[in-house]
Amino acid sequence: MKTYIIYGKANSEYASGMLNKPQDRLPIIKNLTDQFGMKIREFLFTHTESFTFFSVLDANSDEDMESLMNITRASGTWTNMYWSRAFDSLEHMKIYEKAKTGMASYVTT
């Protein structure tokens, strides 16, 4: 599985819903991620200027991630919601090893 990071900013509709009915969102989201065979590693709320939610999860593909994000965005409770692929240190090294090999064909003038 591949590692992904999700981060976004909840809107006032989300805050209003939580004020009216405070609830643990993790079990609700887990039902959704389970449908895509994903594993949640971290599920965190924070209060920064840029984002109020941060999650790390494992998924099989970018397509699965984008499908999850489309459902999340359609809820209307997020100002923005983004995802990106994350690499551990060995994966990161392999990317640069591949780039180094590819660099041999790059000619500058």
Language-model regions: role of each:
Residues 1-51, 62-64, 87-109:
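Short S/T/G/P-rich N-terminal loop/turn motif that feeds into the first structured element of a domain
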Residues 52-58:
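Short cationic amphipathic helices and targeting signals
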Residues 58-90:
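An amphipathic, aromatic/His-enriched active-site/gating alpha helix that lines ligand/cofactor pockets
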